[in-house]
């Protein structure tokens, strides 16, 4: 399951994201964060960290540097 999630993130990064305007308010980007979190912690904990990050990625949040813990 972890490998599938990582594959889907890479697919998004290579084929979908280049066609969209840059919108992520954070560094690293949300997809990079998700890839690293799932690689490091697995699908459950990494997935929770990724969802929490995605919920913060909106115009009313200042963004900035937010590394994977």
Swiss-Prot record:
Record's GO cellular component terms: plasma membrane
Keywords assigned by UniProt, alphabetized: Cell membrane, Membrane
> Membrane topology type, per the record?
Peripheral membrane protein
Localization of this protein:
Cell membrane
- UniProt superkingdom: Bacteria
Can you tell me which family this protein belongs to?
Belongs to the UPF0161 family.
Its job = Could be involved in insertion of integral membrane proteins into the membrane.
Q: Per its UniProt record, what PANTHER family does this chain match?
A: MEMBRANE PROTEIN INSERTION EFFICIENCY FACTOR-RELATED (PTHR33383:SF1)
Q: What's the protein called, per UniProt?
A: Putative membrane protein insertion efficiency factor
Species whose genome carries this gene: Thermomicrobium roseum (strain ATCC 27502 / DSM 5159 / P-2)
């Amino acid at each position: 399951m972890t490998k599938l999630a990582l594959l889907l993130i890479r697919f998004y990064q290579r084929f979908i994201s280049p066609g969209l305007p840059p919108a992520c308010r954070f560094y690293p980007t949300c997809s990079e964060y998700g890839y690293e979190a799932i690689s490091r912690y697995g699908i459950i904990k990494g997935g929770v960290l990724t969802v929490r990050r995605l919920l913060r990625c909106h115009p009313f949040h200042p963004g900035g540097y937010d590394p994977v813990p």
